[in-house]
Amino acid sequence: GIKKILTTCPHCFNTLTNEYPDFGAKFEVIHHTDYMLGLVAEKKLVPSKPVKGKVAYHDSCYLGRYNDIYESPRQILQAIPGVELIEVEGWNKKKGLCCGAGGAQMFMEEQNKDRVNVKRTLQLVDALGNPTNKGNAHGHGAHTIASACPFCMTMLKDGVKSQSLEEEIQNLDVVELLAQSCGVGDPAPATNDSASPAA
């Protein structure tokens, strides 16, 4: 039978960890940030390329408050050269504001004009300071909002878009930043194995 399940979704992590055992499930559930941090600790992944810029980390409700996983995502970010981890003072970890996706809220149109995801996005943007890298969100020195939950990613991406900040702020999973630093996805270097056509 299945012994371990690896999940990128804190909602799935919570359900599989805390509810499935009531129905006889017996397996270990690992969130991808815990798993990837283990690979970094074992030197199987070595973040070496600088990923410059400020990174504001958003705590997912189901990863943090429900399952007390706060440090793994932060330790990954701190292991990446060039990253300046920014905390939203007074609104992080156990006091972090929800992204607004919980309880299927991401599928509802709120009656008032103040959507929770926009409020949270503005908190994160304020913590990053004035984004001055216009037109360079995917380059060096970019400001980044990072999370470790696909639901949060969707809500925060919508929040960034609602403020027309897509050019100034990128929204990435913590592990996407780790992959960048490890060179995952970089184009292969050119080789001289094939002869160039004669001129």
Regions found by a protein language model. Name each.
Residues G1-A199:
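Iron-sulfur cluster-binding electron-transfer modules in prokaryotic oxidoreductases
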